[in-house]
């Protein structure tokens, strides 16, 4: 069976016969852009970003069009595909921030999100990441909401980015178990993971602040720092 991620949907094709046959199609919700999928032990995991746009609170005078307020959110869909011709949604998870990267290792899914901190009209609510976890069942959907408080925020030394790096860890064998969540002041685009540890790579720019006799180009050194987390 082939699972093909396309623009707007996922096509499931049976290739066991002489002629391939489309047996199911999973359509995406409005505003959701899938970017990655995993297949593990009868489960299909679809990861993507959903843009949240909000209308202006009040009418403004004619002027240059402002950037519309938007809050990127990462959404993960978990499907039961033990019967590929009838995929069944069993869980939906949504969290603040843009999806950066993920790794699947030994039945666990590890993920990194980046949440920009908007300094304009900043509030405590806008800084702290929030999450919504929905479990589907025949008896109805169970929705739980959670977040990460200021007392749980961590930071990387010498961080200057106004950004939160959020790490998520899902146990794919226990769909009812809440994911492990952490948030760090800083940002990263590279993640390495195995069954025992996760390594995050961060770019660092070291500027030369020595006084110059005239106007010169700024001098800096670019390095990469690695941080290892035990899983």
Range-by-range predicted roles:
Residues 1-231:
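Beta-sheet-rich non-transmembrane sensory/scaffold domains
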């Amino acid at each position: 069976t082939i699972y093909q991620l396309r623009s707007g949907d996922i096509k499931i094709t049976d290739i066991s016969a002489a002629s391939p046959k489309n047996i199911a199609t999973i359509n995406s919700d409005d505003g959701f852009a899938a970017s990655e999928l995993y297949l593990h032990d009868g489960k299909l995991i679809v990861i993507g970003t959903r843009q949240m746009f909000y209308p202006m609170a009040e009418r403004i005078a004619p002027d240059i069009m402002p950037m519309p307020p938007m809050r990127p959110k990462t959404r993960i869909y978990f499907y039961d595909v033990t019967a590929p011709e009838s995929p069944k949604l069993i869980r939906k998870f949504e969290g603040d921030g843009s999806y950066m990267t993920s790794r699947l290792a030994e039945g666990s899914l590890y993920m990194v999100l980046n949440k920009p901190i908007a300094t304009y009209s900043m509030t405590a609510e806008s800084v702290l990441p929030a999450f919504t976890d929905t479990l589907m069942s025949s008896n109805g959907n169970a929705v739980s909401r959670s977040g990460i408080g200021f007392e749980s925020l961590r930071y990387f030394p010498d961080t200057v980015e106004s950004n939160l790096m959020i790490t998520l860890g899902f146990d794919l064998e226990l769909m009812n178990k809440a994911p492990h969540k952490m948030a760090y002041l800083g940002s990263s685009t590279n993640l390495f993971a195995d069954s025992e540890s996760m390594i995050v790579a961060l770019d660092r720019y070291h500027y030369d602040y020595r006084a110059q006799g005239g106007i010169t180009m700024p001098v800096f050194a670019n390095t990469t720092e690695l941080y290892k987390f035990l899983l």
